[in-house]
Amino acid sequence: MRTKARTDPAEQNGGKARRSLTEKRRKTGTHDFPKDGQGWLGAVQAGADERRIPTEGEKENGEDGDFPNKHGGSRAMYAEIQKHTEDIEERGAFIRQPNAFIQPFGDKEGGLKAEANRFGIYWATGCNWSNRPIIVRELLGLQDVISETRVSPSGETNRYGHAFGQYPDFKDPATGAYFLSEFYKRANPDFKGRATTPTLVDVKEKKAVNNDYHRLTNYLEVQFRPFQPKDAPDLYPKKFRKEIDEFNDWLFPHINNGHYRMAFCQSPEAYDEAYEDFYESLDKLDKRLETNRFLFGDYITDSDVRAYVTLIRWDVSYFHNVGPVKKPIRDYKNIW
């Protein structure tokens, strides 16, 4: 399919961008997804992440973290979920750890300056927050401007954060670090939280500069615009920015974080609340897509990427560890 100029991003997003998203299967560890979807997910076209389901023995021994809930079924949660006790509030609801490094890019005092070959995205394949900037980086053609380094769990993940086990000598090839947390400590010696992904690292200073996954893709879209090729799609157009920001602010608690609210919570009350909220929000999302090919009309935007990385995992991964599934994504005709 021939790609048109930036003035007509619909063709780019329908062809070049879709092919680029398909190539992300290699990056995100995904397998081929059925191609019969005709709705929004079918248009975005990508894969779905697979993760381990607890064995029957683990369930019998209570190692899946299950508890009774009014919806029936079982929450087949992973063992590591139980380790996030610092993120559980008094009534058992999951409250996500605040981002530690939120210094923005921009011209204001203290703002980070966009530079080529200065920053690297440190990410994990199974983390949907990580997949966002990696997908956007490639859609915008920033592969030669911002590096990317994958991290992975290790035996010391709880103490030191993710490691670089897939690289020679178990070291980050760009900085020589052994653990992601080293960048956090170098930026703030008093940091005591969890080193999370994605993290934007200043590879020259070897320190974390931003782990604000809420805004990281926007910085790539706007502040790194001078480094993008002329035919790169505009994922954050000025005329829609206010609406995109408002939509993303709704999307995060209700859809993106909805899975984690169900999976990580420690009380049936918190689970039921998250369950109802998630499916009510899916209904709203499906309704929105009745008249739109994508979330903001004919063009893929930042919001589509954010919704995609969550919903594409649901039917083949997330539902395994959140309990009963009220309705699979494939039954939402406009989303699917």
Model regions: which residues?
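Short, flexible loop/turn elements at secondary-structure junctions
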Residues: 123-129, 152-155, 184, 201-205, ...
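Intrinsic disorder/low-complexity segments enriched in small, polar and charged residues
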Residues: 3-7, 13-15, 19, 24-30, ...
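Short, strongly patterned local motifs
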Residues: 40-47
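GST-like fold's C-terminal all-alpha helical module
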Residues: 192-195, 203-204, 208-336
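Local sequence-structure signature of Cys/Sec-based thiol-disulfide redox active-site neighborhoods
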Residues: 106-159
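N-terminal regions that are enriched for targeting/export leaders
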Residues: 62-117
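Structural micro-motif
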Residues: 161-201
